[in-house]
Structures are given as structure tokens and as C-alpha cells.
Regions:
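Blade-loop segments of beta-propeller domains
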Residues: 27-101
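Short loop/turn segments immediately following beta-strands, especially the blade-tip
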Residues: 17-24, 70-77, 116-126, 174-183, ...
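Beta-rich, blade/repeat-based domains predominating
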Residues: 10, 35-45, 88-99, 103, ...
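Short glycine/acidic-enriched loop and turn motifs that connect beta-strands
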Residues: 4-8, 55-61, 110-113, 168-170, ...
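Residue position within the beta-strands of beta-propeller blades
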Residues: 1, 51-53, 106, 163, ...
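A short beta-strand motif characteristic of beta-propeller blades
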Residues: 27-33, 80-85, 130, 136-142, ...
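Structural preference for solvent-exposed beta-strand-turn elements
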Residues: 85, 94-177, 192, 269, ...
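Loop-centered beta-sheet repeat module
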Residues: 158-219
Length: 331
């Protein structure tokens, strides 16, 4: 497992950790100080290459963030830089490989843009092939004065891609041309949230018929019906993750591999919330537990669904939770 820091960062770079598949114990083996202020990262399917955005306002005198490509060597103990490219926007916060791993897409939060990079023969990155800037604003001028793309979410058809935009309260839809690396609008509709929710991240159910969206400002989860054939969506349900107004800063969202449970993290309240998923894809809150630290910015599940690993930003710690037979995490 590799983890990076976020603005304002206090660590030295990318940490490399191993998770014991039986006990869930984490062993951190290396800290690789080769990336300036690393934020979000992703790896190739074969785990031999790593891609990481640096959440920056400028780098080496050039406005905007960067994205770096590395070869993973010596069992993860060493990263060899293959290339570094400008993301053409400030505060890059998310990066994802396209399903064929020939393209990499990045979201620039403050830059209000999305960039597409070709993955070259050596698995490094070429300069951006496409950069699209969103326009508009939301209802809350403190947080939504302009567009703030926050994630890259491929649609189930592997042709379209959604970009959840906190500033616009919608998931912006594009068609992706995987031959040319271009994003275009083609008639598929954006998916709106509710005014002032601050859409952050989303996840599709395995069959593609339900979409779950975490909102940052409202700390709510929206459930949509979704038609993979034409991208049409309808809001079915909105679930609160916190009670009252304190600690209302939604963060990450994940579905259990079984599809039976959905998890959400909330910063400020510093909790992990578990929802049961019924046969219609609707949610019922099942449990909530402290994240084991402050500001659980992200978390993930092991591939077998046995453990949940939470990354607490302000307390600088990783916490492991074992998931019981009912889907509830326990430290």
C-alpha cells in the first residue's frame, strides 16, 4: 500500500506499506521522498507502475500541479521516475488510469479542469493530449464560486466518464475517445446533485444500475438509478452520514466487494459510516464508528473485503478495521 500527503503536507513523500492478509497488520517498509507534496495516486494492474499527482499551486515556476509516473522496483522499496508532466491546473486531487491503461486522467480542483495524458511505451506519461475547463458556479459562494472537479469516474459502458464537480453540484459527463485521448460532450446528460451539497466522489454498483455519490458540504450520500445504455439517472434516496451540523465534511465512499454494504467517511465528525444495501440498491444506516484519528480523508477495502484501511490526515495515521460477517468494521 502506498499513501501520500495532502496540502498542507507534513510527511516526506510516498509511504510504502504491506498489509498482512490474515491479521490485517500494517508494516511500513519505506518512505520515498521523490514526489513534491503527493496527493492521490493509482497503480497499473500489474502493480509495476505508479502514477501520482502533486497537489500544488505551482511547480518550478510553472503555474499548476504535476503528475508523475514511476516504475516500482525492489519490491516497492524504490521508485524510479519515468516522467513528470504539468496537469495544466492547480491543486490536482485525483488521478485514474483508463481501463486499457493507455491513458491517464487527472482532476484539477482549483484549476477547474480535467486533463488526459497518454501512457507511453515505457509507461511514462506524455504531455496532456486534452484539457477541458469547466465553467459555472454553485449556490454557496464560499465554496462554490467556480468549478472544482474532484474525481474521475468511468461509466459502466467504458466509453463515457463522469467528473464529480463540487463547485457545480453535478457529475459532468463526457464521451472519451480512447484512440485520440479526447473528451467530448455527446448528448449524454450530466447528473445533478441537490443545491449546495458539494458533490465529491461516486461509485457504481457492479451491475451498473445504481450510482452512489458522496457529497462533501452536506455530508450526504445520494443514491441514483442508472441506465448503462443511455446514461439516464434519477435520484432515489439521500442519506445523512452525520447528525446535526457539526463535523459535516464528507470524504470517501466505497462499496464492499460483495455489494452488500456501502461505507462513507466523514471529516470533522471523524467517523466511518456503514450502510446496508438492499436488493433494490437502497441504503439503511447500519453502524458508525470512529475512524481512529482525525480527518479520515480516504479509506479503502482489501480485495477480499476482510479489512478496511482508513487514512487520517491530521493525526498522520493509518488504522485497520476488520469487517465482520454483518459488514460492520471493528478496530
Amino acid at each position: 500500500m502506498a499513501s501520500g500527503e495532502t496540502v498542507p503536507g507534513r510527511s516526506k513523500g510516498i509511504g510504502v506499506c504491506a498489509v498482512d492478509a490474515v491479521s490485517g497488520r500494517i508494516t511500513c517498509s519505506a518512505m520515498l521522498p521523490s514526489t513534491p507534496n503527493p496527493s492521490h495516486l493509482t497503480m497499473s494492474t500489474d502493480r509495476r507502475f505508479l502514477y501520482c499527482v502533486s497537489e500544488l499551486k505551482e511547480f518550478s515556476g510553472i503555474s499548476g500541479s504535476t503528475v508523475s509516473a514511476y516504475a516500482v522496483e525492489e519490491g516497492g522499496a524504490r521508485l524510479r521516475l519515468l516522467s513528470r508532466q504539468a496537469t495544466c491546473g492547480a491543486d490536482a486531487c485525483f488521478v485514474r488510469l483508463w481501463h486499457n491503461e493507455k491513458w491517464l486522467l487527472a482532476a484539477n480542483y482549483s484549476g477547474g479542469s480535467v486533463a488526459v495524458f497518454p501512457v507511453e511505451a515505457d509507461h511514462g506519461l506524455g504531455p496532456a493530449a486534452c484539457v477541458l475547463r469547466h465553467s459555472g458556479c454553485g449556490t454557496d459562494m464560499r465554496r462554490q464560486e467556480g468549478p472544482h472537479p474532484h474525481q474521475i469516474l468511468p461509466a459502466p459502458d467504458k466509453i463515457h466518464v463522469y467528473v464529480p464537480d463540487l463547485g457545480l453540484d453535478r457529475l459532468v459527463c463526457y464521451r472519451f475517445d480512447e484512440e485520440a485521448g479526447w473528451l467530448t460532450k455527446d448528448g449524454w446528460q450530466d447528473i445533478p446533485g441537490l443545491p449546495g451539497q458539494g458533490i465529491r466522489h461516486g461509485v457504481f454498483r457492479a451491475d451498473g444500475t445504481r450510482l452512489y455519490v458522496m457529497t462533501e458540504m452536506a455530508a450526504q450520500v445520494n443514491v441514483y438509478s442508472y441506465d448503462p445504455a443511455d446514461g439516464s439517472a434519477a435520484l432515489l434516496q439521500t442519506c445523512d452520514t452525520v447528525r446535526g451540523t457539526a463535523g459535516k465534511l464528507g470524504a470517501a465512499i466505497r462499496l464492499h466487494p460483495s455489494g452488500k454494504w456501502l461505507y462513507a467517511s466523514v471529516r470533522g465528525a471523524d467517523v466511518l459510516v456503514t450502510f446496508g444495501v438492499d436488493e433494490n440498491g437502497l441504503l439503511t444506516e447500519q453502524s458508525r464508528i470512529g475512524s481512529g484519528g482525525k480527518i479520515p480523508r480516504d479509506f479503502d477495502l482489501t480485495p477480499d473485503g476482510r479489512f478496511l484501511l482508513a487514512a487520517n490526515q491530521d493525526s498522520d495515521n493509518l488504522c485497520v478495521f476488520e469487517i465482520d460477517a454483518e459488514g460492520n468494521p471493528h478496530p
